[in-house]
């Protein structure tokens, strides 16, 4: 049986408060801090900062 990986599923939530989010994975060992990345929000049709949140 294979070992479990280090990657964890996360949700990137828009800081524009539109409710839009992306899902991705990240390696907890290499990136212990919360992820912030600039991506396109199709609701406001602009690039905004997306912040990491847990998937429920």
Curated annotation (Swiss-Prot):
GO terms for cellular component: cytosolic large ribosomal subunit. This is Large ribosomal subunit protein bL33. PROSITE patterns: RIBOSOMAL_L33. Keywords: Ribonucleoprotein, Ribosomal protein. Gene3D superfamilies: Ribosomal protein L33. SUPFAM superfamilies: Zn-binding ribosomal proteins. GO terms for biological process: translation. GO terms for molecular function: structural constituent of ribosome. Belongs to the bacterial ribosomal protein bL33 family. InterPro entries: Ribosomal_bL33 (IPR001705), Ribosomal_bL33_CS (IPR018264), Ribosomal_bL33_sf (IPR038584), Ribosomal_zn-bd (IPR011332). Coiled coil: none annotated. PANTHER family: 54S RIBOSOMAL PROTEIN L39, MITOCHONDRIAL, LARGE RIBOSOMAL SUBUNIT PROTEIN BL33M.
